[in-house]
Amino acid sequence: STLFPYTTLFRSIMAKKSREATQKRFGKTIQFYIPLYLSNECSNHCIYCGFNHKNKISRVTLDDDEIIAEVKVIKKMGYEHILLLTGESPKHSGVEYLEHAMQLIRHYFKQITLEVQPMSVDDYKRLIVSGLHGVYVYQETYCKERYTLYHPAGKKKDYNWRIDTPDRLGIAGVHKIGLGA
């Protein structure tokens, strides 16, 4: 139901025009991506997350050989788009690590997207040069009071830094910005 009382005929015409415009712009394609976890190191203390800094788990950050081995398996599966993920640990998987990893794999993929800790505009610009196409940022809640409860320590505790990430991505010129909650 809509606010404007469209007729069934008018709605079908709009739907047809919309479909045509979408196909003209994007073609008849569906794009799949595959995730690759580069690191589970994390400096945050999010109460809901298995990567929580306090959790006593085996921590791993992939080295060059491990990254390439994973990428070769992924390519055999036919994927052209990859999502690189890490815990939020600038010490273990900061901009230098991500830049290097992207340079290692960029010739394997049409698109590289990240789901990592929020960064500065300059850091995102560096990563664009290394092949960054998109970034996904998840905001677990928009309620500032609840956010503080869920994120008691670590960089992620800074609500404003996190919520302003899409703005920094846009300023940096990142092509695709994905938001989730």
PLM segments and residue spans:
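Short, small-residue-biased leader/transition segments that mark boundaries at the very start
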Residues: 2-9
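Core AdoMet radical
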Residues: 53-68, 74-98, 102-169, 175-180
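A residue-level signal for beta-strand positions that form part of recognition/binding surfaces
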Residues: 6, 29, 81
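Canonical Radical SAM [4Fe-4S] cluster-binding loop centered on the CxxxCxxC motif
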Residues: 24-66
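Catalytic or ion-translocation cores adjacent to nucleophile or general acid/base/metal-coordination motifs
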Residues: 12
